[in-house]
Every structure is written in C-alpha cells, then in structure tokens.
Amino acid sequence: MHKKVDWKVDRKTPSPTPRWAYLDGQVVPYRQASFGLLTHALNYGTGLFAGLRGYWNADERQLFVFRPEDHFRRFCESARLLRMELGVTPADLTAGLLELLRAEGYRENCYIRPLAFYGDESIGVRLHGLTPVVGMAAVRFGSYLGKEDGVHVAVSSWTRVSDNVIPARGKFAGSYVNSALAKTDAVLAGFDEALLLNDHGHVCEGSVENVFMLRHGVVVTPPVTDDVLEGFTRATVIQLLREDMGHTVIERSIDRTELYLADEVFLTGTGAEISPVTRADHRAIGDGRIGPIAAELRARYMETVSGRVARHRAWCRPVYAVTREREPMASGVAAVSERSVGST
C-alpha cells in the first residue's frame, strides 16, 4: 500500500510540486511539463542533469544563485557527450533560470534541477535520431545530509563506474543508479553516506559528493582522472582553501586506509555543501569531532554563496531587480535605500 507523505510534517523533504517549470525556452505551469511512459530517457537513461542552489540573503532581501554560468557550461558540455544539440547557450539557460525563480518568487533557500533528455516516445537503445528536451524546476531546499554534528560514512562494496563505462565528467541520469545502490546500502546499514572506490581501489567520492581529507597538514582530494565529477563546489573549495585560508591543497589518489588515519575528512557538493565526516567504517576521524579546518571552511563557504564576501561576489547572480528609493528621515533629509523587486 502506498504511504502518503504529509508534507506539512516531513520538514526534511522539499516540496515535490513547484508551481512553474522552464521547458524548451518558456516558463510554463509545472503540471504542463509531463511526458509519456515510453519517453526514451525514462526507459534508457538517456538524459543528464545539473544541480544549482539559490541562497536567500535576508540582509539584502535578495536571492543569489551560485555560479550558474559555470554549471550550465558543464551542462552543455555533458550534452555533447550524449550527442545532444541543445540549441541554447549557458547564458540562455541562466536567463531562463532567473525567469523561473522570479515566477516562483522564492524568499528562502532553494534547489534548481536543470534537465536535458531525449523526449521521443521510441523503443530502441541509441543516441542518434532523437530530439532533446531542456527543462528546469526549482524547489525549496534545506540541508541535504542533515547532519550538523558530522557525517558517518561507509566504504561501499559497489565500485564507481569508470570513465570508459559512463563518463564521470557528466551528470548522466542512468549512471546515478550506481550512486543509488551505494547510498541505500549505506543508509540501511546505519550510516549517513557511502564512499565509493574506483577500479584501482582508490577513494573517488561520495554518492553525490567530492571528498577531501587533511593529513599531515596538507589537504588532499582525488584528481578528476580518478573517475570523479569535476564539481564546482570542489573547485570553489580548493580556491577558498588556498587563497582565503592559506592551506596547501594537492590532487592525488587516496587509499582507503588513508581516510582512517586522516586528521579531517569532509564532503563537498552543491546539495551537501560542506559536510564534515567524523566517522568512516566505524572508525573515528581524528578525535571524532568536526575539525577546525572543516568548520572554518563551512562558515566561509556559506558566507560566500549568499553573496556576503565581496571578493567572490561575482560568483553570485542576483535573481531580483534592485531599485533605489528615497525615504524621508526624521531630520527631513532623504536617505537612499535599496529593495528587491519581484520577491513578494
């Protein structure tokens, strides 16, 4: 029997029903973005997706989307690997995203899911002779892993698919069965997240996150040639660690047992943001508490993505137009203030 979810009670689950969707260049009612059971991507996994976040800055009354052009650049590159000709540019998609968010009118953190998939109702495994569909939807969204005191991970028995099987450089719909198998096994065994190894036995990433460790004063993360996603949160974190925090960061392969001996471990991703790991395979990482570098990094990251760090402000795209108003003061002298338009 299907269990109905009470969305008013289930606070950790984002609302499944946005009001609007972006579909092939237009913002339409969400219910209009529906497809048949024989849709090619639904049957064969011939689609790709991206994940972006919007952060509400209450001080400025503004919603900022973090690095949208970079996300859409990778989105378009991934489409090429599936032989898709989308007919849109990263700039076009960014404009469509902003229009969608203005229609939704979110005044809180949200998550945006762009999709490109073969929408033909057709039987037969192939990538040629098909027409892609481009769509987006946005939902209210909080913490992905929901573990403020540290994440417990398990090294999965499932191996990460290699670049010669399904390229890790793209977020392809079908390849995430690999992640789902690992994630569910870990959660059912009492852990919060899974870590996957590649064919060479090296640590790749979490089910949907990149992984970093601190050992002997050096921050280490696997190279993109170890079958990991070229994540923009990963790139952001590397830059913050090096330029803002003054740490040495190197990219090299990581053995499983190195994690057990690490001083700190943390996961990064658009959804997961900065998620410190405090236990791996029932072993404490460091002293079993969130380490100082991960704690500082998490704070800096949240300030950055919400548009509060001037030097990285260019990464944050404001959604709502800002107008300047003149407000009377008690002294009779007018003062200029700013407010966001379209955010009601």
Residue ranges of model-derived segments:
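Short secondary-structure junction motifs
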Residues: N109-Y111, F191-D192
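Short secondary-structure junctions
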Residues: A103-C110, M245-H247
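Helix-start/capping segments and mature chain N-termini
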Residues: M1-V88, D92-E99, F117, S122-T344
